Amino acid sequence: MPDILDKIMAVKRQEIAAAQKKSPLEAVRFDAESRVLTRDFEGALRTRIAAGHAAVIAEVKKASPSKGVLREDFIPADIAQSYAEGDGEISAACLSVLTDKQFFQGGVDYLKQARASCDLPVLRKDFIVDAYQVYESRAMGADAVLLIAACLDDAQMKDYEAIARGLGMAVLVEVHDAAELERALKLKTPLIGVNNRNLRNFEVSIQATIDLLPRLPADRLAVTESGIATREDVATLRAAGVHAFLVGEAFMRAKEPGEALAALFK
């Protein structure tokens, strides 16, 4: 099985080199530091949980390497509004927007459009391998960034977290196994995403989250990611003590993503 993650990271480095020729780091950093205040990503999650509800980070995702195109009529602003409204009772706490172009058919403009259409905090979902992308994330309007432990060494994670927090962004650090979790716990961020999908072979099991939960200190907030498709999945994870969920694929195939979200978390 070819290592998908290595391929993605190689492409990311090429993209960054090209981007820096168009917009040097100094310019992107200036744009990032000039942005107005961020929306409170962590606060939005904790508010839902404190009220006894599941905190849902709803994903705006056109395609994936494993499933191909998920949604042909892909209008990020409409999708974001649908998530924000839900069914009037249950709705998204935050958004996650894919900005990777080559593998997920995402884009920076999609994040801007989604954020402009609602009041929800927005996570930039991409494969960050360079500080340039952290500044770029804030410059495009992201309120939070994803740092994937499998893509970064300890020094990079610490450095990129410091940059993100200095810009007012929340950091969701993503892990898949116990070794990655131990590394993630060295960071300051309380937001720990457990990806139920192994990024090296794209196999999925929600057991990944259940296995790691007991290792999480009480001051950290677990966010389960990937493979959450049924109400049974949600019930199993909630029974295990999970309160925050990042879900995309299950909603992207629905006519009204917000209604699909509400139905899954009833």
From Swiss-Prot:
GO molecular function per UniProt: indole-3-glycerol-phosphate synthase activity; phosphoribosylanthranilate isomerase activity
Domain of life according to the entry: Bacteria
Keyword Lyase belongs to the record: yes
InterPro entries documented for this protein: Aldolase_TIM, Indole-3-glycerol_P_synth, Indole-3-glycerol_P_synth_dom, Indole-3-GlycerolPSynthase_CS, RibuloseP-bd_barrel
PROSITE patterns: IGPS
GO biological process terms held by the UniProt record: L-tryptophan biosynthetic process
Pathway: Amino-acid biosynthesis; L-tryptophan biosynthesis; L-tryptophan from chorismate: step 4/5
Keywords, sorted A to Z: Amino-acid biosynthesis, Aromatic amino acid biosynthesis, Decarboxylase, Lyase, Tryptophan biosynthesis
Substrates-to-products reaction catalysed: 1-(2-carboxyphenylamino)-1-deoxy-D-ribulose 5-phosphate + H(+) = (1S,2R)-1-C-(indol-3-yl)glycerol 3-phosphate + CO2 + H2O
HAMAP family according to UniProt: IGPS_B
Family indicated by similarity: Belongs to the TrpC family.
Protein name as annotated: Indole-3-glycerol phosphate synthase
Native source species: Variovorax paradoxus (strain S110)
Lineage start: Bacteria, Pseudomonadati, Pseudomonadota, Betaproteobacteria, Burkholderiales
